[in-house]
Amino acid sequence: MLLLSVKYTARPGGGEKFVREITDSGILDAVRAEDGCISYDYFFSAESRDTVLLIEKWVSPEQQEAHIQSAHMAELMKIKEKYILNTAVEKAVL
C-alpha cells in the first residue's frame, strides 16, 4: 500500500475555494472511483483554512502513478494554479 500526505498552502482565502472547486467539478468523485484508490480525503488545519492536507491511500505505487496521468488530474492542476502557493508531498510504502 502507498500512503501520501500532501500539504497545500493556499493564497489567502483560497484553501476552501480550492477544495470546493475540486469537489464541485466532480474531480474528487472521479479520483475516488479510480482503480486502486483506497481513500482520498482533504482536511483543513485548525489554525488556518488556507492550509489543506490531502491524505491518499493506494493499493500500489503503479496505480497512484496511473492516477497522476489521468485527465481529471490535469484539470486539478489547473485549479491548483489558481489557489495554491506551495505543495509538500511525503510518501510511504506500507
Predicted region positions:
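Charged, amphipathic alpha-helical interaction segments
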Residues: R11, Q69-H72, L85
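Short amphipathic alpha-helical segments
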Residues: G14-C37, H72-E75
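Generic structural motif
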Residues: R11-G13, L94
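Short, flexible helix/strand-to-coil boundary loops that buttress conserved ligand/catalytic motifs
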Residues: I22, H67-I68, M77-K80
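Absolute protein N-terminus
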Residues: M1-L2, L94
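Glycine-rich beta-strand-turn "strand-cap" elements at beta-sheet edges
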Residues: I38-D50, L76-L94
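Generic detector of short, locally flexible boundary/turn motifs and exposed helical patches
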Residues: L3-Y8, E16-I22, A30, L54-K57, ...
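Short, well-ordered beta-strand segments in beta-rich or mixed alpha/beta enzyme
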Residues: L2-T9, S39-I68
